[in-house]
Amino acid sequence: MISLLHVSLLAMLQLSDTARVFPPMQGQNLEGRTLEMPRDFAGALNVVFIAFKREQQADVDSWGAALDSLRKRHAELQVYELPTLGRRYRLIRPMIDGGMRRGIPDPTVRAATITLYIDKGPFKRALGITTEDRIEVLVVDPRGNIRWQRSGPMTPSLRAELEAAIGR
């Protein structure tokens, strides 16, 4: 019988065996600046959250304490949120982005929130995302190499994995 630990180890090995690169992408942050990703990711390591639904914000927020702790130890760590919507929503982009902007009082968080209005299929395939029902959490280096990738809200085991990926 295969244990949960074995399944987790196999998943980690599969990711390292099929190393992924963050696909070139353009988006605009909630401060109105256009960014080219991964080129404009500013950290030596970047934690990137990809969310597909409004209600997934709670899952993104669940990582907050872990990230606060990591940023105290790693000043070069940057965090980005990428709300990811289909192209058809571009027509109402001002309304969507304006609503998010009003809901985020911190200009630093707004600058790191980059809404994508894209053809989601190729983006998800490039990242190996099979469902929009969970958030994706990635650690991306300055070259766009994905060092770590998992799905869902923070758990103690995922926190330990993230800390190991970043280097305690």
Question: Which residues make up each language-model segment?
Answer:
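A short beta-strand-turn-helix
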Residues: 25-45, 54
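Solvent-exposed loop/turn segments at secondary-structure junctions
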Residues: 54-56, 85-89, 121-123, 145-146, ...
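Hydrophobic alpha-helical targeting segments used for export or membrane insertion
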Residues: 3-14
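Thiol-/selenol-based redox modules, centered on thioredoxin-like
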Residues: 124-125, 132-168
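Structural cue for short, hydrophobic secondary-structure segments
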Residues: 47-51, 81
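Structural microenvironment flanking redox-active thiols in thiol-disulfide oxidoreductases
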Residues: 55-106
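Thioredoxin-like thiol-disulfide oxidoreductase module
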Residues: 88-133
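Loop/turn elements at helix/coil->beta-strand transitions in domains of secreted/extracellular proteins
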Residues: 43-46, 75-78, 134, 142-143
